[in-house]
C-alpha cells in the first residue's frame, strides 16, 4: 500500500477565505482614483454583477478593469467568455498597464490596512470549519501545509493571525513570493 500523502496545498482565495466583499471594495476604491467618476457610490447593481463575473480574474490588477468593463456596459456573458480580449482592449483604450493598475490597487489596499485594519479584515470571511481544520492539521504535524494565494503573503498572515493561526515562514506562497 502506498504511503499517505504528506503535503496539502490549499488555495486561500475562494477556498479557505471568501474575500469577495473586500475585492469589490478595493477594486471600487481603485476605480474611483483611476477613472474619477462623478458618483463615489457604486450603482446598486454593480456589486452583484462584479461577484458573478469575478471568476475571470487571474490577478488583482484586473479587478478595477472589470468594474470599468461593467460600467461601460459590457455584458456579463461577453466578459465570462472573452475576458482576456476585453481586458487587453480596455487597457489599450484607457492607456493603462497591468503594472500601473496593480500598483495602485496594492497602494490603496495598503493604505486601507494601515488606517483601518479591523474594517478591512471584517470584509473577509473564512468558510465554516476552515480555521478549526487548519488548527488540527497544524497541531498534528503529520502533513506539510502550503497555502497558495493571489494576495501578498502579509495579507494572508493578517487574516489568519486574526483567527489566532500563526504560520511558519515558507508555508504561504503568494504574490511576490521569493524562495530563499
Protein language model features and the residues they cover:
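Generic structural signal for short, solvent-exposed loop/turn connectors between secondary structure elements
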Residues: 1, 39-41, 178
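Extreme N-terminal starter segment of soluble prokaryotic enzymes
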Residues: 2-9
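Alpha-helical substrate-recognition element adjacent to the catalytic core
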Residues: 15-157
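Substrate-recognition "cap/lid" segment bordering the active-site pocket of phosphatases
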Residues: 146-180
Amino acid at each position: 500500500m502506498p504511503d499517505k500523502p504528506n503535503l496539502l496545498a490549499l488555495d486561500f482565495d475562494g477556498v479557505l477565505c471568501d474575500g469577495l466583499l473586500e475585492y469589490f471594495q478595493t477594486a471600487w476604491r481603485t476605480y474611483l482614483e483611476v477613472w474619477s467618476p462623478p458618483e463615489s457610490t457604486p450603482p446598486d447593481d454593480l456589486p452583484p454583477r462584479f461577484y458573478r463575473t469575478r471568476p475571470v480574474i487571474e490577478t488583482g490588477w484586473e479587478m478595477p478593469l472589470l468594474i470599468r468593463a461593467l460600467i461601460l456596459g459590457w455584458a456579463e456573458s461577453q466578459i465570462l467568455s472573452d475576458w482576456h480580449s476585453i481586458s487587453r482592449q480596455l487597457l489599450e483604450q484607457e492607456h493603462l498597464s497591468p503594472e500601473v493598475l496593480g500598483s495602485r490597487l496594492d497602494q490603496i489596499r495598503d493604505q486601507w490596512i494601515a488606517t483601518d485594519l479591523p474594517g478591512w479584515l471584517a470584509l473577509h470571511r473564512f468558510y465554516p470549519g476552515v480555521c478549526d481544520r487548519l488548527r488540527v492539521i497544524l497541531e498534528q504535524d503529520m502533513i506539510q501545509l502550503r497555502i497558495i494565494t493571489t494576495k501578498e503573503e502579509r495579507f494572508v498572515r493578517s487574516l489568519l493571525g486574526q483567527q489566532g493561526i500563526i504560520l511558519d515562514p515558507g508555508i504561504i506562497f503568494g504574490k511576490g513570493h521569493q524562495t530563499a
